[in-house]
Amino acid sequence: MYPIVRLLKDAVLASRQPRLAPLDTHVSRHHCWPWDIDIWMELNNGRTLTLYDLGRTMLTLRSGLAGVLKREGWAVAVAGTSIRYRRRIKAFERFEMKSRAIGWDDRFIYVEQGMWKANGDCANHALLRTVVTDKNGIVAPARVIKAWGLDID
């Protein structure tokens, strides 16, 4: 089940936070709820990816990319993910998630995300290769970055 309540809550919170520059970091705070856990009473790996999806969504809202995507008729997709699980997040534990775009090449925009425990330990860390598409296929990141308002010259 997709966490629609969490999505709505995060969207409301993100709308009340200051706008981010394109390469700034979105920080959100979460709890590991019973519906997030696996049989070992810790955050399920699949739910981790879902929470990262929510973090990227809020990043696009706060940075203004969501408006650019809507205006241009573009969509975003994850083309690849590399994730490292380092520490367990147990049921009811609080954690912080950080999401930021870190760069791009001629086809992809790269996003870094991490979940951090209250004691400062990195619970998991992901590097995502994302792509912006339109009806004709992949949109060049330079075009996206320019529409997003970042001067790349």
Task: Describe the predicted segments one by one.
Residues M1-R16, I89-E96, R100-D153:
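HotDog/MaoC-like acyl-thioester-processing domains
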Residues L59-G103, H125-T130:
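Hydrophobic beta-strand-centered segment that forms part of the acyl-chain substrate-binding groove
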Residues M1-A77, D134-D153:
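Hot-dog-fold acyl-thioester-processing enzymes
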Residues D36-D38, N44, R86, K90, ...:
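Generic, ordered loop/turn and secondary-structure boundary motif
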